[in-house]
UniProtKB/Swiss-Prot annotation:
Source species of the chain: Dictyostelium discoideum
Underlying gene: ube2j2
Example GO BP: ERAD pathway
Primary enzyme class: transferase
Taxonomic lineage from the root: Eukaryota, Amoebozoa, Evosea, Eumycetozoa, Dictyostelia
Protein name according to UniProt: Ubiquitin-conjugating enzyme E2 J2
Lumenal side: 241
Domain UBC core positions: 5-164
UniProt function note: Catalyzes the covalent attachment of ubiquitin to other proteins. Seems to function in the selective degradation of misfolded membrane proteins from the endoplasmic reticulum.
UniProt pathway: Protein modification; protein ubiquitination
Transmembrane segment boundaries: 220-240
Catalysed reaction equations from the record: S-ubiquitinyl-[E1 ubiquitin-activating enzyme]-L-cysteine + [E2 ubiquitin-conjugating enzyme]-L-cysteine = [E1 ubiquitin-activating enzyme]-L-cysteine + S-ubiquitinyl-[E2 ubiquitin-conjugating enzyme]-L-cysteine
Amino acid sequence: MSTQVCVTRLKKELLALSKNEDIKDIFIAKPSISNILEWHYVIYGPPDTPYHGGYYHGQIIFPVEYPYKPPSILMTTPSGRFVCNSRICTSMSDFHPDTWSPFWSNCTIILGLISFMTEDENGFGSIVKSKETRKQLASQSMAFNLKNPVFVKLFPELISDYKKKGTFYSSSSTPSSTPPPSSTPSSSSSSSNISKRNVPIPTTKTTPQDTNKKKEQKNNNIPYIILFIALIIILLYLFLK
């Protein structure tokens, strides 16, 4: 039986996800109708990867001790990157309770999984098929998901959009760039391809105060220059005399 702390936390995360516009073209996630500890996600294959156009359904199974203990992460849809329905080893899964942080959430976990997915790092539950195979599986992913009654029951809106638009994405035909791992600590964990968003480069600006300081420094040097010139003139006079 789930604890009140766990249930309250997961309800807050569900509300936060529903209001998060930044992830609407990256993934969708919601709990099972009958069990709030069993969440289902769908990752939209990131652009510029072999997964682009894919539609990857999986589960996050939370322990009753959540958020103090990490969940199990699985992927059901064949991707060429993970073993289907097998627990995936990441720094934010139950394989590594020592690296888990209670501050991480569903959103953090899924973004971290996407980051790990776009790399070729090995681990328990991971495989690395050829790019051609992964592209082929991406094109077949919707057909596979439509045979899954759990997917069909939980994500009717995605199926409806797919049939109407002929696209895998719920809000637009062109998904936004995937967002950075800062979220993942391999993390947050991984530093990877998730975050290919434009990051402003810090620039150094000259303020009026800086300009005034430079002028003052320049003015302070003038007497020394005049004195130096005067000494040269005196020395020349004595030498020529």
